[in-house]
Each structure stands twice: as C-alpha cells, then as structure tokens.
C-alpha cells in the first residue's frame, strides 16, 4: 500500500519527469499533451494499484509459490500459493510473511473445492522450506460460517489466538488462529 502522507513524495506538479510533453516543433505531435494516468505511473497516487512484480520461489507438479518483490526491504512480503487440485481446479491462498510468521487470510464466501489440500500443502511448504515459526490464519468474526471454520481449522491443528497476543495486530473484528511450527523438532528429522 502506498503511503500518500509520506513527506518524501513530491507533488506531481513538481516532478520534472512527470510533466506533460509540449509541442517543441510544428508538425506531428511527438507526444500527447495529456498526462499519463496516475495509476500507470510507478509510485503514482492514483486510484489504481501499481502492478506488482513477482518472483517464482518454488514449483512442483502441484504447488507453485511466488512472492511479490518488495519495494522497500523491511516491509512484509506477500506470498502467493497456488495448488493444482485437478487440471481445471486450482486452490489459491495469499499470505504475508513477517517476522518468521506467515499470515494467511481466509477469503469471504465458501472455500473452494480443494482448499483443504491447498492449505495442507501451504503448511508443509511453510514448515519445510520457509522455516517459519507460526502460520496464522485470519477471517472476519462476523462471517456466517464462523463456527464451521473454527471446527475445521481446529481439526487441522490450529488454535484460537487470544486477544493481546504479541504476534498479531489488535483487530477486534478479525479472528486469528495459529498453527505453531516447532522448528527444533523438524531440524532433527
């Protein structure tokens, strides 16, 4: 997300590289007098998002993992998991990697077929390849399917995170569950 309050961002009127082109010589237009839409300018403050670049981290016959390239180091990284359930069905999960923890947002609505297999592949990858300490899932507390989600994720080994946990943000409208990964045990295997 772009911080529009950042004082280091110059107003567009003061950025020489973003000035409109003017007719320098008579004849055909060398470039348009109209400015480019702000959403198309990297770092622009338009309503659209800048297209993010992503790098392939891992790929096998079922699982593909990509990561958005960070603009600034020190910021959380966005990781995308795609698990091929069948030739035509893909289970997709977006996550944020921050401080040795992976945060996975459960999208609103019904989970797609194959979501369980995709989540299990995500957990295995997070433990074996990413070496994270925790995988957190989060979803809105007001969801109609909250009870079945709690039951399903509890069955998979997730535990409810109590308010005030140091690893999660204070969000009263969001439910967090955690899957702790004991890296000491996995290193001994």
Curated annotation (Swiss-Prot):
State the SUPFAM superfamilies in the record.
Acyl-CoA N-acyltransferases (Nat)
Q: Does the keyword Ligase apply?
A: no
What InterPro entries does this protein map onto?
Acyl_CoA_acyltransferase, ODC_AZ, ODC_AZ_sf
Provide this UniProt record's keywords sorted from A to Z: Nucleus, Phosphoprotein, Polyamine biosynthesis
Job of this protein:
Ornithine decarboxylase (ODC) antizyme protein that negatively regulates ODC activity and intracellular polyamine biosynthesis and uptake in response to increased intracellular polyamine levels. Binds to ODC monomers, inhibiting the assembly of the functional ODC homodimers. Does not target the ODC monomers for degradation, which allows a protein synthesis-independent restoration of ODC activity. Involved in the translocation of AZIN2 from ER-Golgi intermediate compartment (ERGIC) to the cytosol.
Subunit notes for this chain? Interacts with ODC1 and thereby sterically blocks ODC homodimerization. Interacts with AZIN2; this interaction disrupts the interaction between the antizyme and ODC1.
Give the UniProt family note.
Belongs to the ODC antizyme family.
* Full protein name: Ornithine decarboxylase antizyme 2
Its lineage opens with:
Eukaryota, Metazoa, Chordata, Craniata, Vertebrata
């Amino acid at each position: 997300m772009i911080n529009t309050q950042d004082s280091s961002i110059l107003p567009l009127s003061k950025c020489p590289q973003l000035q409109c082109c003017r007719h320098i010589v008579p004849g055909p237009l060398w470039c348009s007098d109209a400015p480019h839409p702000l959403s198309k300018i990297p770092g622009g403050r338009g309503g659209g998002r800048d297209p993010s670049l992503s790098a392939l981290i891992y790929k096998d016959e079922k699982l593909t993992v990509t990561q958005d390239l960070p603009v600034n180091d020190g910021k959380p990284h966005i990781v995308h998991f795609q698990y091929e359930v069948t030739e035509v069905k893909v289970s997709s999960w977006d996550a944020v990697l921050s401080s040795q923890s992976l945060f996975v947002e459960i999208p609103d609505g019904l989970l797609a077929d194959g979501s369980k297999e995709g989540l299990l592949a995500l957990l295995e990858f997070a433990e074996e390849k990413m070496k994270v300490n925790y995988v957190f899932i989060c979803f809105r507390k007001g969801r109609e399917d909250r009870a079945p989600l709690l039951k399903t994720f509890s069955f998979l080994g997730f535990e409810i995170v109590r308010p005030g946990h140091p690893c999660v943000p204070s969000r009263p409208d969001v439910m967090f569950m955690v899957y702790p990964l004991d890296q000491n045990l996995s290193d001994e295997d």
